[in-house]
Amino acid sequence: MESLRITDDLENIDPNIRIEKHIDNFEDTRIYFMFYIFKSQDSPIFIWVSDSPTFSTLSVSMKIPIEKSPVTSHLLESNSITSNDSSNSLSQRIVIKFKVQTFLSYSISQDIPEMSHFIEKTIFDLLSKYLKK
């Protein structure tokens, strides 16, 4: 058990993954963003967005040849229907824009349309920057 350790520096352990973190504020709410980006171009991305240290939803979205729009599924659902719906629709839009399979955990406690728009814009801006590297 002594050799067991928790680290936030995964990149030093595995050079095939890059972790990007971002904190932003919407009015009085602090919003945390974390991106796990694998170095292989065919690999999915994992995005965690939350206003608290929780992991209550997880959806996956991907483009498949027989469907016109990306298919989405909940892997972990919260009690909040709004959070589940936001996670699904946002992960679909990420797949459409960036053409990459997406795992998204979206745990925002408030259902404010302006905040949702702010979060989506922030994610898209950050992904545009991170996926170019």
Swiss-Prot record:
Keywords for this entry? Chaperone
Q: Does the keyword Chaperone apply?
A: yes
- InterPro entries assigned: PAC4
Question: Where exactly are the transmembrane stretches of this chain?
Answer: none
One short Pfam family name for this protein? PAC4
A Gene Ontology BP annotation from the UniProt entry: proteasome assembly
Q: Which family does it belong to?
A: Belongs to the PSMG4 family.
Identification of the protein by name: Proteasome assembly chaperone 4
Q: What organism does this protein naturally occur in?
A: Dictyostelium discoideum
